Amino acid sequence: MKQNSRFEKKLYTTWGRNIDKNNVLTEYPRPLLKRDADSYVNLNGIWKYAFTASNKRPVRFDGDILVPFSPEAPLSGVNRQLKPNEYLWYERIVTFDINRLSDNSRFIIHFGAVDQICSVYVNGIK
């Protein structure tokens, strides 16, 4: 991770400095509700992000953000705070094999850190 200031260097721990962007916090976050590996997909990792002044879906994204870290966190790679009049968009292409689901099972997308309002698009449909 790129460090932007001498103060920011103090915020990193040994673990933060050595984080693997392709393998970020892959364990299931609630040990008492642990899922089988074939029924759980962790969405942590690199996503595209965009800050916008409009609630319209952006055409272009500003760059990459490392999830699960918030944009303000140095480990996110963004180091920017969302302003009150802005919207924050994330985008990532994820492929799931729906055929793996049994007839009586459900497909659930869980976001553990949505603070306000969230709109989810699947195959471009809200």
What are these regions (language model features)?
Residues 38-87:
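Core domains of carbohydrate- and sulfate-ester-processing enzymes
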Residues 24-25, 47:
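Short, compositionally biased strand/turn segments
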Residues 24, 40, 68, 76, ...:
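A generic signature of intrinsically disordered, low-complexity regions enriched in glycine/proline
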Residues 25-30, 73-77:
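Short glycine/threonine/proline-enriched tight-turn/helix- or strand-capping micro-motif at secondary-structure
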Residues 2-20, 33-35, 48-54, 80-126:
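Accessory beta-strand-rich segments of carbohydrate-active enzymes
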